[in-house]
Amino acid sequence: MTATLHVIFGPSGAGKTTYAHAFARREKAVAFILDDWMARMFGPDMPDPIEYDWMIERVQRCEAQIWSVVAGCLAAGTSVILDIGLMRRADRDRVREIAAATELPLQFHFVTASAEARRARVAERNVVKGENFAIEVTPELFDFIEGVYETPGPGELDGAIISESA
């Protein structure tokens, strides 16, 4: 079986991390969750309130390391599933370009839910701090992320696996 690069994207609070963990268990793939890496590596040093430039610099560092480890997994024949944000179409296009340049089998997974359900889920996650909690997403941060997120454009979901959570 050929190792495949599975990539999740969707708006904040849609259930992407839950989906990634379930997929990894079911398909015996390795999940790379950017929020987990950020929390473990930089959580103790995180400024309060979070500063955008501080965050972006560390996201880029984490992504570079994640891609390095992903390459090793794929070369060893192990499929991976990435949950690394990909909030903008340009970010998703960059993943397509990387996969094409390295001839990696690529499968996108689009996970979505209504804005009301996502906002409620994030608020609950902030209180419960369960398995999928990495950092607190305040209502202000949620609104900021909503403003950054770009819904899939024409043709972007062609061939994607679509999951709508309640």
Question: Across the structure, where does each feature detected by a protein language model lie?
Answer:
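P-loop (Walker A) phosphate-binding loop of NTP-binding proteins
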Residues: 11
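Conserved substrate/cofactor phosphate-moiety recognition/catalytic segment
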Residues: 14, 18-78, 124
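Glycine-rich phosphate-binding loop used to anchor ATP phosphates in small-molecule kinases
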Residues: 57-106
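Hydrophobic anchor at the beta1->P-loop junction of P-loop NTPases
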Residues: 8
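Conserved beta-strand scaffold positions in the cores of enzyme catalytic domains, especially
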Residues: 29-31, 106-108, 157-163
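NTP-dependent small-molecule kinase module
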Residues: 2, 98, 143-166
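A glycine- and Lys/Arg-enriched "phosphate-lid" helix/loop adjacent to the NTP-binding pocket
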Residues: 100-150
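Walker A (P-loop) ATP-phosphate-binding motif of ABC ATPase nucleotide-binding domains
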Residues: 5
